């Protein structure tokens, strides 16, 4: 039996089984996974910045979760249509049908290359009770009635799901058919009654097949849909930034996994110009050992920085109000450290004043993934003294080239970063008090440690959001850094749906 189901669109870049996924890990290093069988990815679009792979293990786990949902729905199934059939002068009526006992369904998935997924459900045994009544009219009338208990020794449901990309970057899923195999044994107590029952048995099988298919496909169309609709294609964060997770290509299926390919780009909200550069190709993923893999391009970070840079969000003023201990004072407190002690000439010429530091970028900060995560920050440090008499004195200007090595952390559906070490170079661009060869390293090092690094880490602590579902615990997790590619591999356990 095949039931044709309508096509429905889903406004998200993830397949329905991804509703069982939530990333929650705090590890930053792990051993690389090695496999002997290479699994090529399909990446035809140069805009891909984010790839998700759900493996056969992940689909099997999700298929069993769906089977558990079916089990709960069958427990509360309280209506099966009555059956009335008339054949060869015999009218058979079956009423008050009810499922009185059944074994928990077992679910697993079968990936169909270049097509989609088949959700297979197996119910080992089911018992259905009801009342029967038959009447035959010829040159005499004979009728009888009674109760019965029918046994389904094994029931198999095969639900085929076709998956493609919608016009707006979400997913379109079509439940193309539900095939069911039912082995029904119906015993009314005597050979004569069983002959009569055999007339109704095919019709009863059809009713049960239809009911089971309706419930199972409803899990996809209603339960999965309600969760998927909460997973957006675009996420606005920090009020002004938008992460675009729209799907760029149809999902790619092999027997071992499904991959989806996404934009993975951060832009300024309502900015029509977009990002003027594209992501570099991601390293082909060969692993299939975990249930889920996420590949994140360094383009995600670079587009985020460009959006901030192009809207002047990376320029800022630093005064004593921003730093501890009055470090920018030209006259130090007793026993304290300040710029007047680091550079005595400033303290002598401008006593009891406070320096204002302007920090701005020449270029957008640049992230590079290549075995490690590195951030390159090029900017200008401009030191001024706003005198109490109202005059503003420009002291010196330093060009800064900062290279910072970062750690990456994925926790609570966000990708976080933090500087773990850094190096920098300076160029003396403007200096009214000191010679060209003056060493500004101690001062620059102080400013970087006390303000620039904390400022960058503050942004890293905000994190970049990932489209995931809460309520899941991940296990057996690894985070791997390769050229332009950050790869997260994990298994997961669902505590509740």
Model-identified regions with their sequence ranges:
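Hydrophobic h-region of N-terminal signal peptides that target proteins for export
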Residues: 16-22
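Short, low-complexity, polar/charged sequence segments that are solvent-exposed and flexible
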Residues: 139-140, 148-150, 169, 178-180, ...
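Sec-dependent N-terminal signal peptides
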Residues: 7-15
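Eukaryotic helix-linker segments that join adjacent hydrophobic helices
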Residues: 86-156, 160-177
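Solvent-exposed loop/turn segments at secondary-structure junctions
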Residues: 157, 179-182, 494
């Amino acid at each position: 039996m095949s039931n044709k189901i309508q096509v429905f669109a889903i406004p998200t870049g993830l397949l329905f089984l991804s509703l069982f996924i939530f990333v929650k890990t705090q590890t930053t290093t792990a051993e690389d996974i090695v496999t002997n069988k290479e699994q090529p990815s399909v990446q035809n679009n140069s805009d891909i910045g984010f790839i998700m792979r759900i493996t056969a293990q992940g689909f099997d786990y999700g298929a069993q979760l769906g089977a558990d949902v079916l089990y709960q729905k069958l427990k509360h199934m309280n209506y099966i249509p009555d059956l009335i059939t008339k054949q060869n002068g015999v009218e058979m009526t079956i009423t008050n049908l009810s499922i009185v006992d059944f074994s928990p369904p077992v679910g697993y998935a079968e990936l169909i290359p270049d097509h989609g997924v088949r959700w297979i459900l197996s119910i080992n045994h089911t018992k259905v009770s009801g009342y029967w009544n038959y009447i035959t009219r010829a040159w005499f009338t004979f009728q009888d009635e009674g109760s019965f208990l029918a046994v389904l020794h094994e029931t198999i449901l095969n639900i085929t799901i076709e998956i493609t990309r919608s016009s707006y970057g979400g997913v379109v899923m079509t439940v193309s058919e539900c095939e069911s195999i039912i082995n029904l044994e119906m015993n009314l107590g005597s050979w004569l009654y069983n002959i009569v029952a055999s007339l109704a048995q095919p019709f009863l099988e059809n009713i049960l097949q239809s009911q089971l298919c309706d419930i199972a496909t409803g899990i996809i169309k209603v339960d999965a849909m309600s969760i998927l609709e909460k997973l957006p294609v675009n996420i606005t964060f920090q009020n002004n930034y938008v992460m675009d997770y729209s799907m760029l290509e149809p999902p790619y299926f092999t027997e071992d996994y499904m991959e989806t390919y996404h934009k993975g780009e951060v832009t300024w909200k309502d900015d029509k110009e977009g990002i003027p550069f594209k992501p570099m190709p991601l390293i082909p993923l060969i692993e299939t050992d975990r249930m889920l893999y996420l590949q994140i391009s360094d383009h995600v970070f670079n587009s985020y920085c460009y959006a901030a840079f192009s809207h002047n969000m990376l320029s800022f003023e630093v005064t004593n109000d921003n730093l501890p201990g009055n470090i920018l004072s030209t006259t130090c407190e007793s026993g304290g450290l300040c710029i007047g002690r680091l550079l005595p000439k400033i303290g002598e010429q401008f006593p009891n004043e406070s320096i204002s530091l302007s920090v701005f970028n020449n270029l957008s900060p640049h992230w590079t993934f290549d075995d490690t995560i590195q951030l390159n920050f090029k900017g200008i440090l401009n030191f001024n003294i706003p005198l109490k008499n109202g005059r503003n004195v420009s002291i010196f200007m330093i060009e800064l080239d900062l290279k910072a090595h970062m750690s990456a952390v994925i926790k609570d559906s966000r990708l976080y970063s933090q500087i773990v070490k850094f190096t920098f170079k300076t160029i003396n661009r403007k200096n009214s008090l000191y010679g060209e060869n003056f060493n500004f390293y101690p001062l620059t090092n102080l400013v970087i440690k006390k303000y620039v690094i904390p400022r960058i880490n503050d942004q890293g602590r905000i994190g970049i959001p990932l489209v995931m579902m809460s309520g899941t615990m991940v296990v057996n997790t690894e985070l791997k850094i390769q050229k332009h590619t950050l790869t997260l591999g994990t298994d997961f356990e669902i505590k509740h749906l």
